[in-house]
């Protein structure tokens, strides 16, 4: 009897270890990451990155566990180590924990734009065209390319909590403010909030923030076997055209 119990105990430990090894922890930014990560109160997950992660682990032995946090809180959790074998998205341009261990292939190219009210249109070529105006940014996100212009007084910095607040500021202060953000997020959230696209002037901001690629980002000590699996599946999604299909659903 003792031998049987001992055997069952070893089997349970082995199964538990397997279950833990098969678990992948996916980190989601609450509210501010649409269309890359879309969620409702930490549930009903979708979006470009989320759908890519779901497609990678579909019909596999891996279980994806979702963890949703406000952006700064998520970064703090990941910098402290987070759960084992975590996945989110990142870029070499972002630094910190979202740049330390990235997928072999990029998933999307980010373009930044300058959004202003169409009631007072102006042509933007460089930051001198923004002299005396205020640039609206989302709380929590850093923009190193803009810091020198805030520091020397070329423009003023204004922070808001979400996209709705950003667009409201533009509509209330035409000609005095402009919102800087990723083009994909700008367009998605205008549609999501059911605002008239004609109310806004959208211009390229690549002269200040050049276009760059984003990738899946992994925990620095991710299991090499799992990371290899993700890279292989991501390459398959790209070569089959499924990656482009996912992106087209949202942009």
Place the predicted regions along the sequence by residue.
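Bacterial N-terminal signal peptides that target proteins for export
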Residues: 1-8
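Sec/Tat signal peptide C-region and signal peptidase I cleavage site
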Residues: 15-23
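Extracytoplasmic small-molecule ligand-binding "clamshell" domains
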Residues: 22-98, 159-160, 240
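Periplasmic-binding protein-like
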Residues: 30-32, 109-112, 195-231, 251
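Extended ligand-binding regions for polar small-molecule ligands
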Residues: 50-60, 133, 215-246
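Ligand-binding cleft/hinge of the Venus flytrap
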Residues: 53-61, 105, 129, 139-163, ...
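Acidic, polar ligand-binding/catalytic clefts
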Residues: 66-129, 140-143, 204-208
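Short helices/loops that flank or line small-molecule/ion binding pockets
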Residues: 72-84, 101-102, 163-187
């Amino acid at each position: 009897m003792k031998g049987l119990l001992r055997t069952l105990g070893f089997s349970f430990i082995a199964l538990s270890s397997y279950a833990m090894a098969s678990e992948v922890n996916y980190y989601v930014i609450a509210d501010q990451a649409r269309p890359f990560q879309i969620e409702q109160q930490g549930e009903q997950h979708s979006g470009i990155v989320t759908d890519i992660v779901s497609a990678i682990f579909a019909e596999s032995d891996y279980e994806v566990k979702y963890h949703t946090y406000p952006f700064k809180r998520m970064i703090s959790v990941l910098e402290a180590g987070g759960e084992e074998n975590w996945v989110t998205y990142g870029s070499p341009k972002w630094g910190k924990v979202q740049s330390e261990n990235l997928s072999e292939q990029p998933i999307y190219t980010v373009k930044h734009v300058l959004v202003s009210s169409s009631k007072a249109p102006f042509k933007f070529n460089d930051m001198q065209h923004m002299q005396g105006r205020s640039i609206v940014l989302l709380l929590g996100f850093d923009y190193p390319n803009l810091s020198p212009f805030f520091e020397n007084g070329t423009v003023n910095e204004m922070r808001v909590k979400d996209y709705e607040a950003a667009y409201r500021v533009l509509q209330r202060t035409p000609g005095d403010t402009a919102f800087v953000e990723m083009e994909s997020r700008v367009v998605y959230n205008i549609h999501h909030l059911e605002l008239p696209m004609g109310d806004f002037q959208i211009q390229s901001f690549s002269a200040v923030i050049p276009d760059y690629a984003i990738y899946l980002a992994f925990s620095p000590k991710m299991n090499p076997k799992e990371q290899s699996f993700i890279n292989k599946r991501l390459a398959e999604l790209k070569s089959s055209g499924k990656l482009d299909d996912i992106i087209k659903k949202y942009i």
